Amino acid sequence: MLMTMTEFGRTVHQNGSLGTDHGRGSCLFVLGNNVAGGKVHGDVPELLVKDALEDRRDLPVTTDFRSVFADVAGKHLNIDRSHDIAMFPGWEGERFKVMT
């Protein structure tokens, strides 16, 4: 089992230095046995649609990373859903189903 993610996303549009700035939306990769693989999970915004970007530059956050982590912990490490609040204090979301 391997999960990888960045701590921040990148803006879609370039800044004045022809680079990009820290953004909100990002991606997370989950690889291994029992992963519902071969597809992109979640919502992928259409970048050419008017108002698809936040502040005309950021991908919107569509999935809370904790929901993916909780699903992987639950299925891969056999951690019961009742322990999600201990893993992520204050979080009350639902597990995002990436595991089979």
Region roles according to the model:
Residues M1-T100:
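Feature marks hydrolase-like catalytic cores characterized by long aromatic- and Gly/Pro-rich stretches
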